[in-house]
Swiss-Prot record:
Gene3D superfamilies: Cytochrome P450 (1.10.630.10). It is a single-pass membrane protein. Pfam families: p450. It comes from Arabidopsis thaliana. One of its GO terms (molecular function) is heme binding. InterPro entries: Cyt_P450 (IPR001128), Cyt_P450_CS (IPR017972), Cyt_P450_E_grp-I (IPR002401), Cyt_P450_sf (IPR036396). This is Alkane hydroxylase MAH1. Heme binds at C444. It comes from the Eukaryota. The chain crosses the membrane at residues 3-23. It is found in: Endoplasmic reticulum membrane. Involved in the formation of secondary alcohols and ketones in stem cuticular wax. Catalyzes the hydroxylation of a methylene unit in the middle of alkane molecules to form secondary alcohols and possibly also a second hydroxylation leading to the corresponding ketones.
Length: 497
């Protein structure tokens, strides 16, 4: 069986690689894929993978915002790509009940288990309600704010001061990932891994998460039998995925075991810890009957999903945000003027231009570039496209933010002013048009905490430091389910006087 799997994998990629190199001669500027016999559109898609995000912009502009991708015969990889706000509103809101994540999503994202990002129906409803109660708990909110403040003071500021003093090159994406990993770990587990330090020690979880996200991305374009064979045999990205998953499981097993021991020894009169791990270990099962606080696997799935979301999305936003500021000094100047004239330590809401600039950054560079859905029953989308039950629909969030038919002829321009109304307040855009925090009933519950955290970090850096991207540094996204920079963001930092 192992040998058969090897030959299936080898032959499949031999054909695809041959076609790929043949297509190297194909001129750019032709976004629509050719439909080949048997392999259909896959060879052309493989050719586009290094620039998949920009390709989706081109193909959706050329096809009136919706495009049907045909994968190899009998492979189960056909997908409908859309950036049509009408379709998005229909799928995520008005006909939400017919569009669960679906069984294919659970297969592809199997490493997340039964976390809130993968479950559907009654279990999702209970997890959503329990998460809502957690994210609106005042103690939890206070823990979020205090952990951000302490990590800024004891982690980010000393690191940036040291880099400025020694005039060394730092990798800002890595810095933000470490900061967010530390703060999300404190908030979700009560444990501070202290990954952000002057020494910048190796972080096993970070590397494991990055590998997992890349492997999950490529699963979307492979038949399930193929990537499962690769995983079983242990080759390619799937081999790395197995190792990464073992690292994650080992880390969370240790944290959960330690906390259970603490809970046993904790006197009944002592207060609970404020973090998510303790909350879910003591969740009220008379209220949330489908939750399993006594099962370590359930706790692992829930907390892993929350830590991953907290680390990856916010760090992605900040990385692209500061890169955009480096390209648009006039925006940086306006931000500093606003901070100097309107800011007080008690009210970040007064910084309207900062909020607008972050929103504009997320429009162009959303942390999650795609959303995957599957209809439970056949349906007809507002665009007129018919979709079968259990078919794959990919909402192209990255492309949505760049559609001229949605955002105007200046859609590719970085203009925070588009988010400011005539009276100087923030302009609201519907979530099916601006999907940085998802849309409909699955809208991100941590939106307000994430925005607060981003503003706190941005404020600290903008007010106290100048930074410069090193000359010749290439900025491009890596193909992944998360919008990360392939080469990071290498900068030098100086402290403002």
């Amino acid at each position: 069986m192992a040998m058969l799997g090897f030959y299936v994998t080898f032959i499949f990629f031999l054909v695809c690689l041959f076609t790929y190199f043949f297509l190297q001669k194909k001129p750019q500027g032709q976004p629509i894929l050719k439909n080949w016999p048997f392999l259909r559109m896959l060879p052309g898609m493989l050719h586009q993978i290094p620039r998949i995000y920009d390709w989706t912009v081109e193909v959706l502009e050329a096809t009136n915002l919706t495009f049907y991708f045909k994968g190899p015969w009998l492979s189960g990889t056909d997908m409908l790509f859309t950036a049509d706000p009408r379709n998005i509103h229909h799928i995520l809101s008005s006909n939400f009940g017919n569009y669960p994540k679906g069984p294919e999503f659970k297969k592809i994202f199997d490493v997340l288990g039964e976390g809130i990002l993968t479950v559907d129906f009654e279990l999702w409803e209970e997890m959503r309600k329990s998460n809502h109660a957690l994210f609106h708990n005042q103690d939890f909110i206070e823990l979020s704010v205090s952990s951000n403040k302490s990590k800024l003071k004891e982690g980010l500021v000393p690191f940036l001061d040291n880099a400025a003093q020694k005039n060394i090159i730092i990798e800002l994406q890595d810095v933000f990932q470490r900061f967010m990993f530390d703060t999300s770990s404190i908030l979700m587990t009560g444990y501070d891994p202290m990954s952000l330090s002057i020494e910048m020690l190796e972080v096993e979880f970070g590397e494991a998460a990055d590998i997992g996200e890349e492997a999950i991305y490529y699963r979307h374009f492979k038949p399930v039998i193929l990537w499962r064979l690769q995983n079983w045999i242990g080759i390619g990205l799937e081999r790395k995925m197995r190792t990464a998953l073992a690292t994650v499981n080992r880390m969370f097993a240790k944290i959960i075991s330690s906390r259970r021991k603490e809970e046993i020894s904790r006197a009944k009169t002592e207060p609970y810890s404020k973090d998510a791990l303790t909350y879910y270990m003591n969740v009220d099962t008379s209220k949330y009957k489908l939750l399993k606080p006594n099962k370590d696997k359930f706790i692992r799935d829930v907390i892993f999903s929350l830590v991953l979301a907290g680390r990856d999305t916010t760090s992605s936003v900040l990385t692209w945000f500061f890169w955009l500021l480096s390209k648009h000094p006039q925006v940086m100047a306006k931000l500093r003027h606003e901070i100097n004239t309107k800011f007080d330590n008690e009210d970040l809401e007064k910084l309207v231009y900062l909020h607008a600039a972050l929103s504009e950054s997320m429009r162009l560079y959303p942390p999650l570039p795609f959303n995957h859905k599957s209809p439970a029953k056949p349906d007809v989308l507002p665009s007129g496209h018919k979709v079968d039950a259990n078919s794959k629909i990919v909402i192209c969030i990255y492309a949505l933010g760049r559609m001229r038919s949605v955002w105007g002829e200046d859609a590719l321009d970085f203009k925070p002013e588009r988010w400011i109304s005539d009276n100087g307040g923030l302009r609201h855009e519907p979530s099916y048009k601006f999907m940085a925090f998802n849309s409909g009933p699955r809208t991100c519950l941590g939106k307000n905490l994430a925005l607060l955290q981003m503003k706190m970090v941005a404020l600290e850096i903008i007010r106290n430091y100048d930074f410069k991207v090193i000359e010749g540094h290439k900025v491009e996204p890596i193909p992944s389910i998360l919008l990360r920079m392939k080469h990071g963001l290498k900068v030098t930092v100086t402290k403002k006087i």
